[in-house]
A protein has these predicted regions:
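N-terminal [4Fe-4S]-dependent radical SAM core
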Residues: 1-20, 235-239, 248, 297-308
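C-terminal accessory region of radical SAM enzymes
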Residues: 149, 157-158, 188, 198-240, ...
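Short, acidic, Ser/Thr-enriched surface-loop or helix-capping motifs
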Residues: 254-255
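C-terminal end-of-chain micro-motif
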Residues: 1, 323-324
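Conserved glycine-rich "GG(E/T)P / GGGxP" loop and the immediately following alpha-helix
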Residues: 13-206, 211-216
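Solvent-exposed loop and edge beta-strand segments that line ligand/cofactor-binding
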Residues: 41, 241-244
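The −1 position to Zn-ligating cysteines in a subset of zinc-ribbon hairpins
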Residues: 26, 30, 244, 311-314
Length: 324
């Protein structure tokens, strides 16, 4: 874990070391609709999760830690224990940013977040832009559940959340903004759209004034104008540098066997991104580095980076340094 490259925001004034982890524990839930697969029994002990968090923080001198997609950890029976453990190991000035999905709210999750004494930021990722598309992707009736969960976050969280929506068409942008604006209005929050990523200081300033920031991003903005082209290109080279906050490692998933799976940043089957399906085929950290440092991958990154098609900083942080 200590060899993971620190991630940097592309703007120097916001630059800091941090890492992003998602824990892909196993359970016996029927997850076809949400995860695209049935996964088996729990097999990652809480102590192992603590060890990974602690090693990561110490190894990278992290000022900011992202246990990404934390509400997906409803599949882990001790999600709240993990959040509380962050309280034990946090250092002065460290911020914890929880990236959650509105499909799930684990028991006690909101209460646990409200009890934390250090600074945290809850970013709620919404997949699907209207009732029809949501139910088509997630299963009939799921949209109603999501709306109910969002209302709970808005009413019960001590600090206002940030909402993060991907969109591809202008119609989806319009539906997204109307959808979240109406929900926020119900509980007395104003909405302000932002185009910078969730690390930007302006997010905090907006929240401090009692306004909900809504980060609506065009999903293809860092890669190419035509998302279909990305998928076609991925078919050829077996990876796609796909991210939404100026770095290649949006999240890494670690299982109990020590396998590390790219999540969000790189997909073996990127069609899963649009369907909100994670393809966790066996894929170790060594595999990831081999792909990143291959001539084919670096050439692709170099060509697209210099053409301004996406803004990952691999060229500046990777040992290959072919752009410099």
């Amino acid at each position: 874990m200590k060899t993971i490259h620190p991630r940097y925001n592309s703007r120097p004034e916001y630059r800091m070391h941090y890492a992003s982890l998602t824990f892909n524990s196993k359970c016996n839930a029927k997850c076809q609709d949400c995860c695209g697969e049935i996964i088996n029994k729990p097999d990652m002990p809480l102590e192992k999760v603590k060890e990974i968090l602690n090693v990561t923080i110490q190894g990278l001198r992290i000022k900011k830690i992202y246990p990404s997609c934390l509400a997906e950890m409803t599949l882990i029976p001790y999600v709240n224990d993990i959040v509380k453990y962050m309280e034990e190991i946090h250092t002065a000035g460290m911020i914890v940013s929880q990236d959650t999905n509105a499909r799930f709210i684990p028991d006690g999750f909101i209460e646990t977040l409200n009890s934390l004494t250090f600074s945290y930021h809850l970013s709620i990722s919404i997949w699907g832009w209207d009732e029809e598309s949501w139910n088509r992707l997630q299963g009939e009736g799921s949209f109603e559940t999501v709306v109910g969960n969002i209302r709970r976050y808005l009413k019960e969280l001590k600090y206002p959340p940030t909402f993060s929506f991907p969109y591809i068409t202008d119609e989806q942008y319009t539906k997204t903004l109307a959808f979240i604006t109406e929900l926020c209005k119900e509980v007395g929050y104003q909405v302000q759209t932002v185009t910078t990523n969730s690390d930007a200081p302006e997010i905090t300033a907006i929240k401090d004034s009692g306004i909900i920031p809504v980060y609506i991003r065009k999903y293809s903005q860092h890669v190419t104008e035509n998302i279909v082209d990305v998928f076609c290109e991925q078919e050829k080279i077996d990876y796609v540098p796909f991210n939404n906050c100026d770095n290649l490692f949006q999240a890494l998933t670690i299982d109990s066997l020590g396998n590390i799976y790219p999540c969000t940043g790189m997909y073996r089957k990127p069609f899963a991104v649009l369907a909100n399906v994670n393809d966790y085929s066996p894929f170790t950290y060594k595999d990831l580095l081999d792909i990143l440092h291959s001539d084919k991958a670096m050439a692709y990154i170099h060509d697209n980076y210099t053409a301004g098609k996406f803004a990952c900083n691999l060229c500046k942080t990777c040992s290959a340094r072919i752009c410099n």
